[in-house]
Curated annotation (Swiss-Prot):
The keyword Ribonucleoprotein applies. It comes from Buchnera aphidicola subsp. Acyrthosiphon pisum (strain APS). Homodimer. Part of the ribosomal stalk of the 50S ribosomal subunit. Forms a multimeric L10(L12)X complex, where L10 forms an elongated spine to which 2 to 4 L12 dimers bind in a sequential fashion. Binds GTP-bound translation factors. CDD domains: Ribosomal_L7_L12 (cd00387). Belongs to the bacterial ribosomal protein bL12 family. GO terms for molecular function: mRNA binding; structural constituent of ribosome. InterPro entries: Ribosomal_bL12, Ribosomal_bL12_C, Ribosomal_bL12_C/ClpS-like, Ribosomal_bL12_oligo, Ribosomal_bL12_oligo_N_sf. GO terms for cellular component: cytosolic large ribosomal subunit. This is Large ribosomal subunit protein bL12. GO terms for biological process: translation.
Length: 122
């Protein structure tokens, strides 16, 4: 007769805390593993999987009261023509620039916020 995983879990759930600690210690010795070691290695792997973001998008949420200044700033930042920059700004909420460095994104955000736009970096 084979014992199922559910039966093992049910038996463990009925044990006292001290008996569970003894069981863990016995399993560590029998299989040559350490419960604390696996926890640390899992945390290390999670840190490796999380990459630091290097490219950002500038998202125009709200134009603000100074539409002309926002259009001029967007035009100079994107290299678009006047009509294209105006159309882009008027389509807010929208992405203004994609895949730019963190420094460039923060600089553009500050410039646009200074002229009254509401900006989000994603």
């Amino acid at each position: 007769m084979s014992i199922t995983k559910e039966q093992i879990l049910e038996a463990i759930s009925e044990m006292s805390v001290m008996n569970v600690v003894d069981l863990i210690t016995a399993m560590e010795e029998k299989f040559g593993v350490s419960a604390s070691m696996s926890i640390n290695s899992n945390n290390h792997n999670e840190k490796d999987l999380r990459e630091e973001k290097t490219e950002f998008d500038i998202f125009l949420k709200v134009i603000g009261p100074n539409k002309v200044s926002v259009i001029k700033t967007v035009r100079s930042a994107t290299g678009l023509g006047l009509k294209e920059a105006k159309d882009l700004v008027e389509s807010a909420p929208t992405v203004l620039k994609e895949n730019i460095s963190k420094e460039d994104a923060e600089s553009l955000k500050k410039t646009l916020e200074d002229v009254g736009a509401e900006i989000e970096i994603k």
